[in-house]
Amino acid sequence: MASWALSAALLCLGGAFAYSELHSLSLREGSALGQATVPGPPEEEQPVTKDCGIAPLRGAVEGSRIIGGSQADTGAWPWQVSLQVQDGDILMHVCGGALVRDRWVLTAAHCTKEARDPLKWRAVMGTNDLTRSPYHSRNIRITDIIIPPDFIMETFVNDIALFRLKRAVRYNDYIQPICLPFGVFQKLDQNTACFISGWGRTREEGNGTTILQEAKVHFISREVCSSDQGYSGMIPNTSFCAGHENGTFDSCRGDSGGPLMCYLPEHSRYFVMGITSYGHGCGRRHFPGVYSNPSFFQEWMTHYLSQGNINRLFNMDIVLGQVLTALGSVILLGVT
């Protein structure tokens, strides 16, 4: 986060900087590595799933705590995932992610630029320190990567993806799913407790960190974010801005795909309101982080989250790394 800037990649795409890349930390396998309303399609309010958005080691009372760019306590964000790419016997942190079901991680589509083959990916959960593998952490292979067919890498339109775990993860105090914002109508302002977290750079030209960082942010109106001083109207309709106008807290390299999470007192839970997408540098004045809004993808996500085994949807031989367009998505399939 920048200024301390939470990291994500400066892949120079279309003049903007993506918040994901293979940062310099390499790990051996076994190591765990302005008021604004969130825009979204109209829908009827739905009951919130009970078993999500609760951090047992954090406590609901901390939902209003002000965090100013610091190391996260162990277990503070039990849905935080480190998505890592394997190169030989080395694992490297590339992007963050958010555990939303016991076999599904929500992240940013542009993260797949680093590796299209699902079998090169691992999801590390249950730890804040990527150099350690505590007993409660898990390292699970990825078997499928699902991307919207209308994702545009150059402009970050529809920058969202689902990674499917090879096996269901068992929840514990350090591993929990976060709630999806489907059917939640909430006007978010500077009094709403929203946070970002990740293992990215703590300043724009710095290195990634092995210890999970966290910071409190607030939503920034589209008018302010898209002004001539800022992004000049280039924010995708499926995205929004958050951070601080002066750049005090922001996401940066290595943070892509990580959650922007808000604590909603009426539900006593955390919700993933955004997925870290891109920004112009890290922590720069007038250029806050840009986040994909999961609410726009409710139908798309719900379809896949309800499926048991992706591979059974296709009556054909599955070839490693084959790209299929089906059921309204691009699916990168691996061998299970």
Curated annotation (Swiss-Prot):
The active site is at H110 (charge relay system), D159 (charge relay system), S256 (charge relay system). Residues 334-336 are cytoplasmic. GO terms for molecular function: serine-type endopeptidase activity. Residues 1-18 form the signal peptide. Its EC number is 3.4.21.-. Disulfide bonds join C95-C111, C194-C262, C225-C241, C252-C282. Residues 19-312 are extracellular. InterPro entries: Peptidase_S1_PA, Peptidase_S1_PA_chymotrypsin, Peptidase_S1A, Trypsin_dom, TRYPSIN_HIS, TRYPSIN_SER. It is a single-pass membrane protein. Disruption phenotype: Male mice are infertile. Decrease in sperm count and sperm motility, as a result of decreased numbers of pachytene spermatocytes, diplotene spermatocytes, round spermatids and elongated spermatids. Increase in the rate of apoptosis among spermatocytes accompanied by abnormal chromosomal synapsis and failure of double-strand break repair during meiosis in the testis. This is Transmembrane protease serine 12.
